[in-house]
Regions:
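Extended intrinsically disordered, low-complexity coil regions enriched in Ser, Thr, Gly, Ala
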Residues: 172-187, 199-200
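Non-catalytic DNA-recognition/assembly elements of restriction-modification systems
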Residues: 7-33, 147, 203-214
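Short, solvent-exposed loop/turn positions at domain surfaces
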Residues: 60-63, 134, 166
Length: 214
């Protein structure tokens, strides 16, 4: 939220532009139809088809009040925006009335703003602008979020930052897969080492704890 951030990529030195979220996004208020794909927003994975999160559709049969989502829209959980529950949709579909759907007013890098909206400074702003007595009832609708001020870089710098973050996320994903593979290997190894057949073949020697601890 600084006009002159301390950490920037080489070649970018222009001051960030001050604006309101309402200058960047408008609310999409179009209502959907029952045959459109039902979407949901998760904290870690952003916008996902509900069928990939829950095997069974437990939503209301009457979806006439559900909101339309188009590819490229920013969608957030109105009651969990202060936790960073938002994402850019790669799908056309509908979401429950508990969500707010934002569509860009101008050309922006939407992925940049999805990451920006998860930063501690913005999370704190979302918390301050949310309405409700306790965290269980906090609610952040478009009339409140559009008033929040922030500083944003040029489109070129937005894209540079967005690509950098995406690259980091890809590398993190690869490392997680590696860790999962190592854990699986460890479980298999331990299962083999301590199986009944393995222990029967092993010769054992008794040690006292004081000997091991030396």
């Amino acid at each position: 939220l600084e006009k002159y951030p301390k950490l920037r990529f080489p070649g970018f030195d222009e001051p960030y532009m001050e604006c309101r979220i309402g200058d960047i996004y408008s609310e999409r208020s179009q209502r959907g139809a029952d045959d459109m794909e039902l979407l949901s927003v998760t904290l870690n994975d952003g916008v996902m088809p509900r069928s990939e999160i829950e095997g069974k559709d437990n939503s209301s049969e009457d979806k006439s009040n559900y909101k339309v989502v188009c590819k490229g829209d920013m969608v957030y959980n109105s009651m969990r925006m202060w936790q960073g529950a938002n994402g850019v949709s790669d799908y056309d579909g509908i979401v429950s009335p508990a969500y707010t759907v934002l569509m860009p007013n101008k050309e922006i890098d939407n992925r940049y703003f999805a990451s920006l909206f998860k930063t501690p400074n913005l999370i704190n702003e979302f918390r301050k602008y949310s309405q409700g007595l306790t965290s269980d009832t906090w609610n952040l609708k478009y009339p409140q979020i559009r008033s929040i001020r922030l500083y944003i870089p040029s489109l070129q710098e937005q894209h540079k930052i967005s690509v950098f973050i995406s690259t980091l996320e890809e590398r993190i994903g690869i490392q997680r897969q590696l860790v999962d593979s190592l854990k699986k290997y460890k479980r298999g190894l331990l299962s083999h080492l301590f199986s009944e057949k393995s222990t029967q073949r092993c010769t054992t020697k008794r040690y006292y704890f004081s000997e091991i601890a030396q």
